[in-house]
């Protein structure tokens, strides 16, 4: 048991070190979804046997380990990437059973260096986050491994997809994808944690199981940290999803409890926008802002795995994650008197605004440290402590005929006096940040202290 904990800790800490070193250099590029641990067969650009981690740790999988052959080569003028990875999960002590096994097979062909297009296909049997936008890794995985707190909910995805994309350098891309997937509920399992090992995990909520056909369109635009404009730029991620399928409603907040099955056909449209602006107002000061809006656009109601929420260290840290019992539930959008295991996200729409001021601190001690320098996993690391002040505001709501402060018509927006708000301060040391946040809209809520490995946004 102890050796298993140590092995898992080494993988997670390695992940945290990589993220921290990137954060310390103000790197804002999106990290790969896995951590390469190296090739076991031979050192070649064309392929080998790869072992990698899913760069997460959670109450459903524990630590997912990916293993299998990979290949990279040229096909005409295109760059070909192939991977056939099996997945074994550490939950239930790496027990060999269907819940602990999965796979991801991918084939990608990319044409062009600075601009061009790419096509690809994949088949997968994996566990996915319901709201990946709220919190970056390794923050979520570290909280689960050390503190037995999982800030995500999870569901199973089994199916295949194809995509085509166009890109220009590293700052603009458009991707169109089609997939056929079976979505399934997953339960929390026997997963280790360093502290609170005698406690129980928060229940992983039941979703609306079903077979669904999904069309996704994603647009990304990122001009952050360009050579001539460090600490400044725009970031935009815009997603549209159309889903069509048959979903099981029984035993969930969207269906009756008095029947064994209640299958309903849903055809829905969902959009999600994440807009950020980074401003360097002096050589050592930044003023950054973020606006998030997402949820139901048209068609039938959203299944549970496509619902949204706000609250917790990733969005409005002055409020505890999945906090209830403080008036109308504008965090998860649970109706009065409805208690659901795991307190799942049920909002059909959410809005979030964040503003952050950062001031880099100057110290001779830090200058001495940075002159000597150290390297973390081969990357140069420098301490650049910054004082941080921030304010957040947001809420979720349901869509339909107006009902109190929880449900609004599709063309209206809740009044700002109903939003949850907080303020906070922090010290970002580069490798990690320590923060305190206090709710403003609910003055009786206690202050929350928390640690982030990566920046808040």
Where are these regions (language model features)?
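Outer-membrane beta-barrel initiation region
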Residues: 22-90, 95-99, 105, 113, ...
């Amino acid at each position: 048991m102890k050796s298993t904990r140590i092995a898992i800790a080494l993988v997670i800490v390695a992940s945290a070190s990589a993220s921290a070193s990137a954060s310390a250099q103000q790197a804002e590029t999106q990290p790969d979804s896995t951590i390469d641990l190296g090739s076991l067969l031979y050192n070649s650009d064309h392929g080998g046997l790869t072992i990698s981690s899913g760069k997460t740790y959670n109450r459903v999988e524990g630590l997912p380990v990916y293993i299998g052959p990979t290949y990279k080569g040229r096909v005409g003028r295109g760059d070909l990437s192939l991977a056939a990875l099996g997945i074994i999960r550490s939950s239930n002590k790496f027990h060999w059973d269907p819940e602990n096994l999965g796979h991801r097979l991918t084939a990608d062909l990319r044409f062009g260096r600075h601009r061009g297009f790419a096509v690809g296909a994949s088949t997968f049997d994996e566990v996915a986050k319901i709201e990946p936008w709220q919190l970056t890794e390794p923050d979520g995985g570290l909280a689960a491994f050390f503190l037995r707190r999982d800030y995500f909910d999870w569901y199973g995805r089994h199916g295949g997809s194809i995509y085509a994309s166009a890109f220009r350098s590293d700052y603009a891309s458009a991707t169109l994808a089609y997939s056929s997937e079976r979505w399934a509920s997953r339960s929390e399992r026997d997963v280790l944690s360093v502290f609170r090992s005698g406690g129980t995990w928060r229940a992983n909520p039941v979703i609306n199981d079903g077979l669904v056909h999904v069309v996704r369109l994603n647009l990304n635009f990122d001009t952050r940290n360009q050579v001539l404009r460090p600490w400044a730029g725009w970031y935009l991620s815009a997603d549209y999803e159309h889903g069509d399928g048959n979903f099981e409603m029984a035993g969930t907040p969207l269906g009756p409890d008095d029947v064994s099955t209640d299958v309903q056909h849903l055809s829905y449209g969902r959009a999600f926008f994440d807009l950020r602006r980074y401003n360097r107002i002096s050589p050592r000061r930044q003023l950054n802002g973020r606006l998030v809006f997402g949820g139901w656009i048209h068609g039938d109601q959203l299944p549970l795995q496509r619902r949204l929420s706000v609250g917790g260290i990733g969005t409005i840290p002055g409020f505890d994650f999945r906090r209830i019992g403080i008036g109308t539930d504008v965090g998860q959008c649970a109706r009065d008197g409805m208690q659901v295991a795991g307190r799942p996200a049920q909002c059909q729409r959410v809005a979030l605004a964040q503003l952050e001021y950062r001031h880099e601190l100057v110290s001779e001690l830090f200058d001495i440290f940075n002159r000597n320098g150290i390297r973390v996993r081969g990357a140069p690391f420098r301490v650049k402590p910054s004082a941080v002040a921030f304010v957040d505001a947001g809420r979720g709501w349901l869509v339909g005929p107006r009902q109190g402060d929880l449900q609004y018509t599709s063309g209206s927006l809740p009044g700002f006096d109903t939003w949850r708000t907080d303020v906070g301060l922090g010290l970002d040391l580069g490798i990690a940040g320590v923060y305190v946040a206090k709710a403003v809209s609910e003055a009786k809520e206690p202050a929350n202290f928390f640690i982030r490995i990566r920046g808040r946004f």
